[in-house]
């Protein structure tokens, strides 16, 4: 599960679309209220400082902490030869005025909302998120129709669901989603 530079660009575009539809004009990240984003699994920020600042502007990353376990995570993603460090995801997104809720089966990084997406989400969670991001979890959930329904139920009317699932990676998860 990751936020790639392409995903970061998608977040910026979706936030611009939501801002535009709410106010009639693009206001970038100057909102008073945070965007509420839910992810299925903990998303590691898998992009470099130069890539992030190419999208968000020079100096954006100056005060964002990096993870103490960056090298371990980079090895797990097989990116230890490409990136030097990983930004702390919640801190990075908070600077974009994104309030992150991570749904997962168990607490791994800390602060996850524990839920099995094979089962229906709670009614009190319906329509509470502006953006739902699946960066590579759906193919690992056995009951894919229920997981998709959960994502739809969690998303506010007018919100967005972003999927970034692997294509043609055999023996990766339960499913291999294709066009």
What are these regions (language model features)?
Residues 1-107, 179:
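N-terminal accessory regions of S-adenosyl-L-methionine
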Residues 29, 37-40, 72, 81-172:
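Conserved SAM-binding loop
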Residues 53-56, 114-116, 148, 177:
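Generic preference for flexible, low-structure residues
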Residues 172-179:
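Short, intrinsically disordered, charge-balanced linker/junction segments flanking boundaries
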């Amino acid at each position: 599960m990751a936020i790639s530079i392409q995903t970061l660009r998608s977040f910026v575009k979706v936030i611009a679309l939501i801002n535009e539809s709410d106010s009639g004009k693009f206001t970038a990240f100057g909102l008073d209220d945070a965007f509420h984003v839910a992810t299925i699994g903990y998303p590691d920020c898998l992009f470099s400082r130069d890539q992030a600042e190419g999208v968000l502007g020079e100096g954006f990353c100056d005060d964002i902490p990096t993870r103490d376990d960056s090298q371990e995570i980079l090895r797990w993603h097989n990116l230890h030869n490409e990136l030097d460090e990983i930004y702390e995801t919640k801190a990075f997104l908070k600077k974009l005025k994104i309030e992150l809720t991570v749904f997962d089966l168990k607490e791994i990084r800390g602060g996850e909302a524990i839920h099995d997406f094979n089962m229906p989400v709670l009614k009190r969670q319906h329509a509470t998120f502006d953006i739902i991001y699946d960066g590579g979890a759906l193919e690992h959930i056995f009951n894919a129709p229920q997981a998709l329904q959960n994502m739809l139920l969690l998303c506010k009317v007018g919100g967005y669901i972003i999927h970034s699932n692997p294509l043609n990676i055999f023996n990766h998860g339960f499913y291999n989603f294709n066009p």
